[in-house]
Every structure is written in structure tokens, then in C-alpha cells.
Amino acid sequence: YSPSMKYKIDFEFPVGTPWNITREVFDNAVLEAAGDVGAEIMTETRVSDFEFNGGVTVKTSKGEFHSNMVIGATGPNDKLAGMVREKRKIKPWSDNQMGTALMWEPVVGKEFVDNVYGDNRSLLVHFKPGGIEGYGWVFPKQDILNIGFGGYNRTIKSVKVKEIWEDYIKLLKKDGYFPKDQDIPPVKGAPLPLDGPIKATTMDNTLLVGDSAGMVSPLSGEGIYYGMHAGKIAINTIKKALETGDFSQKQLDQYHRDWNKVFGKELRDLSFFALMALKLPERMVYYGYRDEKLCEIFADLFLGVTPGGLGKRKPISRALYDAIRY
């Protein structure tokens, strides 16, 4: 839906895509898979500091650990990422580059989801809820609704988030997309980097992966695909470092080149497309409403269904084409 609710894009994905799963189930499955191949899982363990002295010493609430390599993958506020930034002279993210996502997964019952969202589990996206430079969403699952909204901090900080959250739930209730008798929950959220990947993701003995490195789609907020793909690339880099005994920044920079070659341009292009979509959402939804091809591109990229294929999609040139045509 466009901000005015005047224009609406309807698009039906091929059977079988996308799949929705609760984040808790997904995270636990990944954790178990790591344990199955030999990773030692340490819960309730906080990292307090890192020391580099020919290797790396990780100081935690359960003692110190020594290694040749450490990987930062704890999100945009990752302490290790801050150290890489300082070492490589990269400025911290500003409010113009950061966003906040608020999310809630209430159980509403399979009958409600079936009746309202159908067998195909229709997904909802509303642009600019409450004037925020971002979007609200509802992703139905079996008996659960994933509800949330996200946007740039530059606009979120200037409004009352609680009021916008409540207004968005009221809108969903009014339109029948949420049970009218269900209470509105307290608001809670998490930070998101929305300016594309940082310019350096390595230093001696160190790699950054996922949100810590800014590997997030500025359009959809999708980061799992990029983080997991970067993780695979990191494994190959670390294997070579172990074989040669060279854990220097120069050696590890191959990791940065490799992931950048795979999806770096995609994330940079998405940054530009997101700027167009979030700055001019009424216009962009209108173009999608008029142009079936842009509608398909928009739905695909926005919902993160086929990340890694942006180059074939050409969303920017299609949007510019529609701007001239309409």
C-alpha cells in the first residue's frame, strides 16, 4: 500500500515461495547444526574485551580464550566491529545510516490466519506508517502473525514510536487484518544498519560478518542470506590462513574482496533503490501499480525472496523508465 492507501500492488508468488518460519525455530536449528559439526556452544556468556598479541585473547564472563582468529557477528553495535572501524579509520554509523525495526509475533490462531490471509498466506506491506521513512508489515505463518515496522532513525527519533506502533495495530484491526479483541503489546526493537556494507571488514586476526559489517538490504532489512553467505566465504578464508599460518590483515583482505564480488554491488544498488522507494513511496507504489514488471521486481526485492539476483532484475533502470513513461 502507498502512504495514502490510494495505490496498492498485488502480486502472487510462485507456489512454494516464500517460506515463513519463526525466528526462534530458525536460530535454534542453525545453533544445533553448528553443534553437530563440532562447535562448542556457550550460552549466558558475555564478551567484555579483546586483546591482540600475535593472536587474539577474548575476555568473557566465563574466562579468557585464546585463538588465531576471531569473527565479529553480533550486530551493528559489535565491539569488535568498533575496533575494526578504529583500526581502518572508518567513521561510526550516523542516524542517517541506521534504522530501527520493531517486531512482534502474536499467536492469533490458525482459523483467523486461514480466514483472513488465505491458504497462500498473503503478505502485507504499508509504506510510511505514521510518517516514518520506512514501512510496516504483516507476514502470516501457521497460527502466528509477524507484525512490525522499521525505518531510518533520522525520522524515528523525531516521532513518538509508541504512538505510531499503536496506530499501526489499530489500522490492522480496522481493516480486519488483526483480531479486534487482542491487546496491543509493549513496543520493542533492534538496530539495523541501512547504508550498505562498511568499507573494510578485516584487520589482523579478525573478520566481520553479517549486520556487524552492514551486510543488510536497506530495502527489506533482510540480512540472514548475506550473513550466511559471508560466513561460508569466511570459512574458506580461514582455512587458507590456517594452512599458511598467516592471519595478517593483508591475507584476510581476500575475504573482503570475495564477498564484495558476490553481493557487494547488489547491496550498494539496493541502497540507491531504497532511497528512491522510501523517499518517494507514493510514486514508487504507483509505478508498480501501473507496471506489472516493476511490481514483480519490487515484491521480489522488497521481501528478499531471491537475494543474490539483483543484477538480473535491474530495478533502478525499470523505475527510471516508469518515471519517464508515467
Task: Provide a role label for each language-model segment.
Residues D27, G72-G75, D211:
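Acidic active-site catalytic centers that drive phospho-/nucleotidyl reactions
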Residues Y1-A29:
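A conserved beta-strand/loop capping segment in the N-terminal third of enzymes
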Residues E32-Y177:
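Predominantly flavin-linked oxidoreductase catalytic cores and closely associated redox partners
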Residues Y7-D10, I147, M215-P218:
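Short small-residue beta-strand/loop micro-motif enriched in glycine and branched aliphatics
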Residues D49, I132, N153-T237, L242-E243:
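FAD/FMN-dependent oxidoreductases across multiple families
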Residues K239-Y326:
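C-terminal helical "tail/cap" subdomain of flavin- and related membrane-associated enzymes
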